[in-house]
From Swiss-Prot:
The lineage of its organism: Eukaryota, Viridiplantae, Streptophyta, Embryophyta, Tracheophyta. Residues 8-131 form the MATH domain. This is MATH domain and coiled-coil domain-containing protein At3g58440. It comes from the Eukaryota. It comes from Arabidopsis thaliana (Mouse-ear cress). Gene3D superfamilies: Apoptosis, Tumor Necrosis Factor Receptor Associated Protein 2, Chain A.
């Protein structure tokens, strides 16, 4: 593979049972541009225990001594609410001495562990890293910067440095619309209007006064509806369980979601029918396979019986007939002599005379 080939990749890391994990966690290793990478997270912060920290780590032995890579990368914390992912990213250089870069203050732990914020789902956190390695590898002595030169505060920080320099936060679709007290991104405005038109009493008993909480609940509702609109093939049983949890949360918050509960019950029934149908289909396929094997076995036995029947039907040749007749006569003669001897000398003499000897 050419060293000048630009390579990029996306890696997803799912942290199961987040609440029981140790403070420092490493992801499995993944490879980009011939180098081995992994993600490193500090659940209680690398330096500040109020924040969740995430870093991208390059295996030191992946690059020859005196060389370094220029990399553009981003790290995303998935959120169940649309357009609310936490994304930080930017360019930096990796070498043998500075092989870990990332974000000390990635996200407030208080916000991360709050279920209403949408980052933790069933005690599971999903982190996505996008790594873009630029084409050239440059010798370190050609790109060394003056140590006295200040660093741009909009660059990512190396984990070995004393200060934390945060990359720019990537935000998509910043335009928002206020619909009946719910502020949503413009791309979701039409969906919210349709929900409120068809179910005008959905938020009559909603007790949330905080604007951020109101927005989070509406985004939660939109995300739930989008999930339920997937095909049965895409929907897993785990998705349906999570939908149940989401409905309970919305109902407890004061949303009237009876109509959505009915839809979810219908989905569950259809999913059960699908699973039962797939089970029956699998059973029929297994039975059919056994019948096919039995058919092949019977076909083989049939051919064997046909061959044996043809052999049995074959007529005797003249030589076969003579040999068999002579053998039969000799057998009869020997039997008569043996019988005569056992009956006594007189009968034996008679049989001997009848044999032509006088």
């Amino acid at each position: 593979m050419s060293l000048d080939l630009k390579m990029q990749d996306k890696f997803t890391w799912v942290l199961e049972k987040f609440s029981s994990l140790k403070d420092q966690c490493y992801s499995p290793v993944f490879t980009v541009a011939g180098c081995n990478w992994r993600l490193l997270s500090f659940l209680k912060g690398a330096k500040n225990d109020r924040y969740f920290s995430v870093y991208l780590d390059l295996e030191p032995g992946s690059l020859p001594p005196g060389w370094r890579r220029e990399v553009k990368f981003s790290i995303t914390l998935d959120n169940v609410c649309p357009n609310t992912d936490r994304v930080l990213g930017g360019p930096c250089f990796f070498d043998a001495k500075s092989n870990i870069w990332g974000f000390q203050d990635f996200l407030l732990l208080e916000k991360l562990v709050n279920i209403a914020e949408g980052f933790l789902v069933n005690d599971r956190l999903t982190i996505v890293a996008e790594v873009d390695v630029l084409p050239s590898i440059t010798r370190l002595h050609l790109v060394l910067e003056d140590a006295s030169r200040g660093r741009d505060p909009n660059t990512v920080a190396c984990v070995t440095e004393t200060c934390d320099y945060v990359l720019m936060e990537i935000q998509s679709d910043k335009e928002t619309v206020d619909i009946n007290g719910f502020v949503v991104v413009s791309s979701k405005a039409e969906s919210v209007r349709r929900i409120l038109e068809r179910h005008p009493d959905i938020s009559v008993e909603f007790r949330g006064k905080n604007q951020q909480l109101r927005n989070a609940c509406m985004n939660f509702l939109l995300s739930l509806i989008e999930t339920m609109c997937q095909s049965l093939e895409e929907l897993s049983n785990e998705d349906l369980v999570e939908a149940d949890v989401a409905l309970t949360y919305l109902r407890d918050a004061g949303f009237k979601v009876d109509w959505l509960e009915k839809k979810l019950d219908q989905l569950k029934e259809k999913k059960e029918e699908e699973m039962s149908g797939l089970a029956r289909l699998h059973e029929i396929e297994e039975r059919l396979q056994k019948l096919k094997l039995l058919f092949v076995d019977l076909e083989s036995q049939l051919q064997k019986e046909k061959v044996e029947a043809l052999v049995a039907r074959a007529p005797l040749s003249f030589n076969d007939g003579v040999c068999r007749f002579s053998g039969f006569c000799g057998f009869v003669g020997e039997s008569l002599f043996s019988y005569a001897w056992k009956q006594g000398p007189s009968l034996y003499s008679l049989s001997f005379m009848s044999n032509g000897t006088e």
